[in-house]
UniProtKB/Swiss-Prot annotation:
Subcellular location: Cytoplasm
Co-factor remark: Binds 2 magnesium ions per subunit.
Protein purpose: Poorly processive, error-prone DNA polymerase involved in untargeted mutagenesis. Copies undamaged DNA at stalled replication forks, which arise in vivo from mismatched or misaligned primer ends. These misaligned primers can be extended by PolIV. Exhibits no 3'-5' exonuclease (proofreading) activity. May be involved in translesional synthesis, in conjunction with the beta clamp from PolIII.
Catalytic residues (UniProt): E108
Species the sequence originates in: Shewanella woodyi (strain ATCC 51908 / MS32)
Protein name: DNA polymerase IV
Gene name linked to the record: dinB
Alphabetized GO MF terms: damaged DNA binding; DNA-directed DNA polymerase activity; magnesium ion binding
Subunit structure: Monomer.
Length: 364
């Protein structure tokens, strides 16, 4: 397989929500802070600054547990309207350099600068310029990864944080990828990482030597993706109009619940809100599955899904009942429902996919 090599920049804002709060409220600087819900309402941390991370505080951690790790932690309520406003400023900066922008969230995006003529066409210099402009306009710092393919750019953006950047040039891919932990590959979480470790695979180099047929047999379609990523191959183009893949709603409960009847008391509001969100953000889109998610009081979670072409309230309740079979006496602290959205043809990637290594002057 011939790799599609481009000049990809992955921009990742540093502690974004927390950084905005420290910018707007200077008295918070130098103190451990986290943006998230109150502990007495069983809130969850959205993000935290580096001072808090030094105590082990992390995103998606229960606020109460975070306070046990860091008793002096300052919990700040989120201001989503402000974060969205600043994110729009950042995207305006991206647009000065390329139209090929794929936002991943408010604080993260891929940029394809292959055709950009600014900064002598150097992706490294373009990333530096973008980061400098972000700081001048917003007062916030960003980190960047520069590479010929998307997933390596994302990996690279994490290697010189905060307020730094890392470059992986085409001739570096082979040596860089050999020692890269498989857990750095997007999609390889704790469960898949453990499965790979159980067969003796922890690095991309080790996976390269493993029989491809066995990987595909064990991991199916994702096995093929693993084989490609372990060789530094990622043919995905930047998708400026990236389709939403799912719509969901969940709630963290004020108190643990334990029975199916108690869950039934929560479901109607969730399903109603899901329908409203579908109308707002996925109107006209077909669905391909329904999902129910539970998080227990030991913070482990389970999801059950079923293929579905049309949203069915009855199916949500059936999936809920199946989910509770995994409860094992644990209290339920979070309940969620979601739908997967069927893909639509994306005509914007065809032109981008025509760019091949032989056609590029890759000045990194």
């Amino acid at each position: 397989m011939k790799n599609i090599l481009r000049k990809i920049i992955h921009i990742d804002m540093d502690c974004y929500f927390a950084a905005v709060e420290m910018r707007d409220f200077p008295e918070l600087r130098g103190k451990p802070i986290a943006v998230g819900g109150r502990s007495d309402r069983r809130g969850v941390i959205s993000t935290c600054n580096y001072e808090a991370r030094a105590f082990g505080v992390r995103s998606a951690m229960a606020s109460g547990y975070a306070l046990k790790l860091c008793p002096d932690l300052i919990l700040v309520p989120g201001r989503m309207s402000v974060y969205k406003e600043v994110s729009a400023q950042i995207r305006d900066i991206f647009a000065r350099y390329t139209d090929l922008i794929e936002p991943l969230s408010l604080d993260e995006a891929y940029l394809d600068v292959t055709e950009c003529k600014q900064c002598q066409g150097s992706a490294t210099l373009i990333a530096q310029a973008i980061r400098q402009e972000i700081f001048e306009v917003t007062g916030l710092t960003a980190s960047a990864g520069i590479a010929p393919v998307k997933f390596l750019a994302k990996v690279a953006s994490d290697l010189n944080k905060p307020n730094g950047q890392y470059v992986i040039t085409p001739d570096m891919i082979s040596s860089f990828i050999t020692t890269l932990p498989l857990t750095k590959i997007p999609g390889v979480g704790k469960v898949t990482g453990k499965k790979l470790e159980d067969i003796g695979l922890t690095t991309c180099g080790e996976l390269q030597a493993y029989p491809k047929s066995e990987l595909i047999e064990r991991f199916g379609k994702f096995g093929k993706i693993l084989i490609e990523r372990a060789q530094g191959i990622d043919e995905r183009a930047i998708s400026p109009h990236r389709e939403r893949k799912s719509v969901g709603v969940e709630t963290t409960l004020a108190k643990d619940i334990y029975t199916l009847e108690q869950c039934h008391g929560v479901m109607p509001q969730l399903i109603q809100e899901l329908g409203a969100r579908m109308s707002r953000s996925a109107k006209g889109r077909s669905i391909n599955k329904q999902v129910v998610k539970l998080k227990f009081n030991d913070f482990k979670q389970t999801t059950i899904e079923h293929r579905s072409d049309e949203m069915s309230v009855k199916l949500f309740y059936e999936l809920l009942a199946q989910s509770l079979e995994r409860q094992q006496g644990r209290g339920i602290r979070l309940l969620g429902v979601s739908v997967g959205l069927a893909c639509q043809a994306d005509s914007n990637t065809a032109k981008d996919n025509q760019v091949r290594e032989s056609q590029l002057d890759l000045g990194f």
